[in-house]
Amino acid sequence: MSSPAKKRKRNGVDISPQKTRSIESFFKGPAAQQPNQSEPQPEVTEQTLSDEALARKLQEEWNQEGNSPSVAVESNEPTSTELEASASTLTPSIPTDITPFAATTSSQMPKKNTLSLQSSAGTEDSVSLTVPLDQNPQTFDTAKYVAELRAHWTSQGGDASYALLTKAFVLANATTSRIKIVDTLVNFLRLLIEADPSSLLPAVWLATNSISPPFDELELGLGGSSISKALKKIYGLDNQGLKTLYDKHGDAGDVAFEAKKRQAFTLVKPKPLKIKGVYQSLLKIGTSKGTGSQETKQRIVEKLLQDTRGAEESRYIVRTLVQNLRIGAVKTTMLIALARAFLYSKPTGADFEVRSQQELARLKKDELAEMYSNAEEIVKASYARHPNYNDLVPCLLETGVTEELLIRCGLALHIPLRPMLGSITRDLSDMLTKLQGRDFSCEYKYDGQRAQVHCDEKGKVSIFSRHLELMTEKYPDLVSLVPQIRGEGVSSFILEGEVVAVDQATGDLQPFQTLTNRAKKNVEIGAITVDVCLFSFDLMYLNGEPLLDRPFRERRELLRSLFVEIPNRFTWVKSIDATSADSETVLEFFKSATDTKCEGIMVKVLDNTIKINDLKESTQAINGKNLPDNTNQHTEPSESTKPTKEKSNRRKALLSTYEPDKRLESWLKVKKDYSTSSETLDLIPVAGWHGQGRKAKWWSPILLAVRNPESGVLEAVTKCMSGFTDKFYQANKDKYVAGSPNVISRPSWVQYYGEPDIWFEPQEVWEMAFADITLSPTYPAAIGLVSEERGLSLRFPRFLKVREDKSIEEATTSDYLALLWRKQADRTKNSPGQQEDTGWQEE
């Protein structure tokens, strides 16, 4: 008997015969194909039924068995049972050649597990995809798009769609231009500010590869196996099919893109993903703990993939899950984009001022640049003092980019500020030259772990690392010290110091490796085997008042007068005060530091003023030359009144204030490595080649890169095959094995002209020694900084060690590499043409 005719809701889209057949062609053929009821019908069996008729028959049996109405083609709210069935029992495995998922034959179809299918074509958000986000913000008119986007989002639930964020990711990924990337993010943020401000904060987190600040300890905790399992289940891949895609593309996001693109049908119509919804799903993953948490996480991942509309959404959902968007945006890109977006746009009802589109369009290039720079400085300063988007974004929505932002979102207890960093000098002579005319302090640079200690009026203590990670549980012995070191009248504070492993009996310093033997969590005081001492060197907050704008001399005096020293447990860094005229004294102090197992010395400007008499004396001590007597005896530091194109001739103002997240020459570090003939750089391994001969089973040589601080691009600088042990080679090969998440396809954010055998996921920093820096036609590092046609490379690079204490954002920059090259050229007095790399010296 034939199954009764069913009225089904059409998709409303005419599909030509050449395109993929819609679901109606399976469940409801054309009227012309209906059997003539007056003619005798043959006996119907599963073997004689067509695919379409069998599908109708099985659908009816499914519905009758469940005693429920037919599953609607347009269902937007699949139940968890439907999703489980859709993924586990109905999605066929893809063969090795990865053919698209299509209808199976009648003999393959499970008899009682049939759900309605949806064509995966045409489900993308056409409204969001047509917005030209990469336009210049001066000409991008949000008024043209806000009303339509609001109406579109309202029709789909009311919140901003993930499709718009995906559009921004796609455009950012398609260019290496920093300007284009920033423009794209600015316009995207403006649309959210005006059309859906409540989605702005989730969007910022999603666009910065994070779900919370580093001190919140909220992590997704998803392994590669979870992503692979979800890809197989949702997109119908078998193990071999998944491996084929991974081998071809190397990136989990690209694998998801290809799998989604080849998927002809989905079991239910995807429910549009929302920016808020995706972020909330990630929070649920991060907060899932205990029994059953892995299953909960897996279901959330699968639901996200199930609801993606289009291959690009799939790509960026997976990249978000592995927390590597690969869109060429660096840490500061989002801060710049936020600052600029709030110059153009504000939410409905906000009372801060913004510039009109017409007014901004009339600004000259230098006027616009100055306006941008001022806004960016405010936002960056606020974030450096209070690095939490959960607080920064709501304040921006209320105040815009104003000085009030620094007050409302400024320094706060138990929120770590980003630490101030010291510039590197080549040697003591270089340091003395930089600090002519200044009083400065020389401090031992201990070989330990930098720590930021917070204590409030109630006695609560938090300890943070230089990367802002919470490590209070690692140092319960330091926490117990706080009541003893806090002097009379001290109610709350933020101080900074170096935690060093010591012998409590003798006070002898222990190497950093000893400190690494400490457990990171759940450390009990009675079980501590590695004793530590906190050598404090700065005080940034006292009794509710920030001290960042106070001179270093004053901050140091408050620290040493208001806190109590406890020998071998809490004390001050060893230091001396000097000027450039005291070169012999400084040299002796430097030698004593290196003899005491320290890395070298830190040199810090004490005051905000220059003493001209000292400037003359120090200049004579260094080079025997007198300065022209055309200045006052005491003056404030300032930029040169006669700017020149030569950066080396420009004297920057050196203030003694504490500048969070800035690397300034008012703090200089002189390490013992820098005082020898061999310089070191912190480079990022990005690729490798198959070794030859004895090294054939390993990766050798290995390609290394410096970081461009402006674009975030990693610029190849050298290949290295020296300094590695066989044990290291094997561990490196095991880590970067084909098919693992540590191996990727050629990345757009790594600049190199050659073709390595394998590309590494950039994640490590290696300390490298070398003989010289050379101009090179082979490597792009620092190209444009010293030559328009050549980059820089290293002669005879040698691996020293992995810098486990550094992230890739702290690797050597192309700017610094160019600076070293210039200094080298000045020393050797060779012309650039005499220092050219033919491309083979490093091997």
Q: What does each model-found stretch correspond to?
A:
Residues 559, 666, 672, 676, ...:
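C-terminal catalytic or substrate-handling cores of phosphate/nucleotide-
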Residues 688-694, 709, 773:
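Short beta-turn/strand-loop junction motif enriched in small, turn-promoting residues
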